[in-house]
């Protein structure tokens, strides 16, 4: 009996030593490009909660100052995936067969905060109190051919303002837009929630309203990847998407009910703390604005078709086949709500 115990102990010890000596399987790395905004939340949550690690994925989050460079980075291979507003540059690159839309990003919906309209204190004092007053004014955004510029056009259409009378200032980065607002070099601006509140909370501008409340519901942000990623690392992409969609569900349930109406769930504070950590912003500021994410990142094709049509009307892109730009093997489609 004693001999048996000794042999068992020896075998167990050898097994443990062998297991310790064996190299662990390295996680597959994925570089995700995002703007420093709440639109990157699924990546923040997936990384922080271990949803990507569960799938054997190690995500490296890369921050950009604006949306356009993310499409270029993904197309060139500097990033594997991107999540941001769908720009004219995206459509131009996708039309060459380099990029594909895989899932939705933030949606513009009533009660949620994603894209905001701000007015400088000087312009407000001069009478610019609502979006119906933007005709003939200067409006600042980061770059041309973005959903931020599209939002100005949609506001002009709703309030019967001639879009061509608005002088759109292209200031390249959110800090530049904030400086222009504070200094009165622009009358109004369009920014996502985090940089918007960065200016408003310092008294540099006033909030006119949110696109989700002011304009019809629309979807103009997306999660996308390169055709090279789909073709050469398809298994990695699928596993990444499992973690990404799990994170989207976690975000959705933290701030929306089963009917997609705004409410705080049990995980609301936790998600806001995660966002504050990754964005380097005070928690109090993060709590001021919450975007909407569909629980599964479903896509509304019509919204992207209309966005592309507007870019084309402005001479920013040529004819593009939006349907061909969607990775239908991985995307989940849905009709407008």
Where are these regions (language model features)?
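Bacterial N-terminal signal peptides that target proteins for export
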Residues: 1-11
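Bacterial N-terminal signal peptides
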Residues: 9-19
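Periplasmic-binding protein-like
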Residues: 107-116, 204-229, 233, 241, ...
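Conserved C-terminal helix/tail region of periplasmic/extracytoplasmic solute-binding proteins
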Residues: 304-337
